[in-house]
């Protein structure tokens, strides 16, 4: 069900995309780091038992064990580069796989702490993986850390680190910082690199264009999402944003049509009913407006907008 958060500016909805993309993001970093680890194993015949056990756990996808091994070593040797990096990578992997945001941020903080310490080593200057993971970790921290996410993702990108999701995460971070022009540029690069862009990428580009008041461009991406997406939730959100564009530009009939399509295809929705009330109020039909607000209130007695309109 849509709520007020669903229609807020894109920068404040950064976690929507993050949670949906968690599994994909994990796959990207796993491939990159495993290749590097394979090289380490080949050139270091004198590898310690601790490293051997950690690498075994990592390559098996047991990030919890690899994280714990690295923690144990760091408790005794807190500045060892290899274990700092592996703790940072493992904690990041665990963080993005969590359902609970509090658990996610706990692991993300651990990842950032270890990777920042690893950056104190000279070896980190040529290790783009650290900046890549650190940038994504800061992106998960939210809008307040978007400047750091941008900083480290750009360092990784300038080091020619091969990760296809850098432009998309840069787009997210620029949007979170309010730099929607740079956000559009980054998202557009991600779009060009992807023959089949995700719903979230299409919605992200659209929302950045909306924030720039370039509604014609936004509508193109929203319509593409509606036409191509197999996901009903993405389609509902695209229609909702499209209705908002129509309403704000005075195309009330087109906005009303989008709201009713949402209701017909997705069932009753308190937020849609409330927005219909707002639409009718703009048209001067206060009777229909109050009727829609009452429906919204009955469906969701906690709906702040409906309660305010009805003086409840």
Regions of interest found by a model, annotated:
Residues 73, 117-118, 155-156, 189-191, ...:
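Canonical positions in the second alpha-helix
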